[in-house]
């Protein structure tokens, strides 16, 4: 009877899920596989196994590995964008507060995990997928850079800072973001999310002491 009860229970388990749930499962599995095996070592079979789904379901939701990779990169990019834009476009926040939110979003645990950093740099590092990386992420990177440049220009005007250019400071900030991400991936014992935020805020305080003083943790 115990075996029969187990069979009945198993038969009652749902075997289907909404398409968006299955797609998210497969994208999460792709992120895990790329972090473990890089892009070249990631196969649809490995993704299916990681997700606990059949190859048929993988092929149904994503017709090819390239499509799944493209959708995974798009997911990561949009996830990042949604986070940093939450406060960046709020009219009731100061320019300095918006920039602080952008910095915090860059190193948020949901965005800046070792697993996801490995995936970001895997796309950038493998020549076959670099074009896809640029096509997907460059537009959003430029959007963030323009937002930061505008905010820095506002701060420069507010504080009457001399000899500064908002676009140049925004370019430097983007370089710091990329550099700390890479160092966190390569040297995790020396670089943490918290320390990276402190270093970025130290730079901003040096450039704009009236607006970023006493923000370092």
Q: Where are each of the predicted segments found?
A:
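Hydrophobic alpha-helical connector segments
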Residues: 71, 85-116, 166-173, 215-217
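Generic hydrophobic, amphipathic alpha-helix propensity
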Residues: 19-31, 47, 72-76, 80, ...
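Amphipathic alpha-helical packing segments from all-alpha helical-bundle domains
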Residues: 86, 112-121, 131-157, 198, ...
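N-terminal intrinsically disordered/low-complexity leader segments
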Residues: 1-21, 212-217
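Amphipathic C-terminal alpha-helical segment
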Residues: 109-112, 129, 154, 173-191, ...
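Helix-turn-helix
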Residues: 25, 32-71
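Hydrophobic alpha-helical bundle segments that form small-molecule/ligand-binding pockets
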Residues: 92-94, 127-135, 142-169, 207-217
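Hydrophobic alpha-helical segments that form the core
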Residues: 164-184, 196-203
């Amino acid at each position: 009877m115990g075996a029969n009860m187990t069979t009945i229970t198993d038969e009652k388990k749902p075997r289907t899920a909404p398409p968006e749930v299955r797609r998210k499962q497969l994208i999460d599995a792709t992120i895990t596989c790329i972090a473990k095996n890089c892009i070249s070592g990631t196969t649809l079979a490995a993704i299916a196994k990681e997700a606990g789904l059949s190859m048929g379901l993988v092929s149904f939701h994503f017709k090819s590995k390239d499509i799944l990779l493209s959708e995974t990169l798009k997911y990561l990019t949009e996830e990042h964008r949604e986070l940093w834009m939450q406060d960046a476009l709020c009219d009731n926040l100061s320019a300095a507060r918006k920039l602080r939110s952008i910095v915090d979003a860059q190193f948020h645990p949901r965005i800046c995990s070792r697993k996801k950093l490995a995936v970001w740099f895997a796309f950038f590092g493998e020549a076959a997928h670099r074009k896809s990386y640029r096509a997907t992420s460059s537009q959003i990177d430029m959007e963030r850079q323009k937002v930061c440049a505008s905010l820095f220009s506002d701060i420069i005007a507010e504080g009457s800072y001399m000899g500064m250019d908002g676009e140049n400071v925004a370019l430097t900030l983007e370089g710091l973001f990329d550099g700390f991400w890479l160092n966190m991936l390569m040297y995790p014992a020396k670089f943490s999310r918290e320390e990276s935020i402190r270093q970025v805020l130290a730079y901003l305080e040096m450039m704009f002491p009236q607006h970023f003083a006493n923000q370092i943790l």
